Amino acid sequence: MQLSKSILLAALAATPSLVNAMLPIHIKNYRFIKPSSATNSESDNEVFFVKGVDYQPGGSSGYDADSDTDILSDPEVCARDAYAFQQLGVNTVRIYSLNPDLNHDKCMTIFNNAGIYAILDVNSGNYGESLNRADPSGTYDSLYLSRVFKFIDAFKNYPNVLGFFSGNEVINDQSDYAKIDPPYIRAVQRDMKQYISKHANRSIPVGYSAADNTDLRLATFKYLQCNSLDGNKVNDDLDISKSDFFGLNTYEWCSGTSSWESSGYDKLNSTFEDAVIPLIFSEYGCNKNTPRTFDEVSEGLYGGLKNVFSGGLVYEYTEEANNYGLVKLDDSGSLTYKDDFVNLESQLKNVSLPTTKESEISSDSIYKCDNSAITNIYSGFGTNNFTLPSQPAEIANMIEYGVNGTNTGKILTDYAVPTTFNYTIKNNKDDTISATISYDKANSLNELDVTATTVAKSASTSQSSSRSLTSSTSPSSSTGSSSSTGSSSASSSSKSKGVGNIVNVSFSQSGYLALFAGLISALL
């Protein structure tokens, strides 16, 4: 396709605006992949393991949709916690509830520069902000999805967003929830992934966090990761609705009393050996015995399970009523490390993980949707023969045209990220720590261009060999119809290469000059 001269001339007049940021994580088969540079070479990129914590200070009551604050709106708090995350040795946080209407630029920039990725739940416990497991058909509507799409808009431009969770423990063994909820989870994931492919500048993985129920979680996993009716060919409708990664909330290993065998960890490898999407523990850290020693870190998750699982997130960062915290916050906002913090820090320091290149990971990611295999595990599981609820016209319209959200976040170029903060941090001996945040230059490898999206989108059609991660261009939609029967080739883990199958164009200084020269040539 030829570029029009008007578009070419507009591009020549545009000046690139570059944002230094972390390189976004992508997926290949059952592994997360962290690019080693903006060239995104499979021979250099390495498998990424999540070493993280669940982060929701204040617990479920700490989120108020009517408030002008949430846990990522105060940069002073984020700087304090970024320091603690660095000392703990984590690279990822999971956040359960956020307000998509608030500005999160400073906090996400701090986390980016500190080397912290985020996995974000798109839902909250408020009315209209989640799928009601008791009434999925009545709550799968435009009110709910408009909030989900606004959430995606608010966070899609932060490269340190590792992924979104479409739901948390929606499918459980109460009532008939395992029967009625599964198709609606896939419907929400379909809608999210279609929206991302239409309105985001990159593929962002969409996953699901499963309840701590041994039989039900396996049935859920097989249902949510499948993308083929015959096991030989990917079905587009199934691929766009499958989970890109899968989280297990598991509390089976309790410090001091559990072992590899008694915890059931010895069965996890064989149970999930056929995974074609990344597996993590989205919550772990039994608190039956305190302080927790986290033996399951070195002996389990990053030990015997490391060939199948990709790490996990300890529950949880701050001490709440349920006594799972790693740190205690006082009324002034200052924090003190618990013994649990020190023990987890020690365990994470002693983790020894293999260095595996992306090129060593198979690209095969086909998994058969097998109704009998799923119902043999959990007889009451509702696959509905892998047919999904129809996509309401209002939702299809939002996917096509966007939700016109007023808040779209970005990494800041003119923000002097803080190295100190006005809170006191004490260790587990109650000694005050002299705290200074460090920022590794490696967290600014990605030069994101935030201009000239029209030209970049057009130019991408003639740059099929480019796999650069440095563009902020919006991919053209490949979904055709936004209806539930429409197909999409822009699934956020499609073919599990690069950042999905969306081709991006580099707009680093050298890349921009190369495009400039190409445009001149086209004009001539």
From Swiss-Prot:
Disulfide bonds: 78-107, 226-369, 254-286
Post-translational modification: The GPI-anchor is attached to the protein in the endoplasmic reticulum and serves to target the protein to the cell surface. There, the glucosamine-inositol phospholipid moiety is cleaved off and the GPI-modified mannoprotein is covalently attached via its lipidless GPI glycan remnant to the 1,6-beta-glucan of the outer cell wall layer.
Propeptide cleavage-removed residue intervals: 499-524
InterPro entries assigned: Glucanosyltransferase (IPR004886), Glycoside_hydrolase_SF (IPR017853)
Binding site for (1,3-beta-D-glucosyl)n 2: 169, 212, 217
Top-rank taxon, per record: Eukaryota
Sites where the protein binds (1,3-beta-D-glucosyl)n 1: 96, 168, 315
Glycosylation sites: 201, 269, 350, 385, 404, 422
Membrane topology: Lipid-anchor; GPI-anchor
Active site per the UniProt annotation: 169, 283
Enzyme class: transferase
Further facts: Present with 16400 molecules/cell in log phase SD medium.
Protein name as catalogued: Probable 1,3-beta-glucanosyltransferase GAS3
Gene transcribed to yield this protein: GAS3
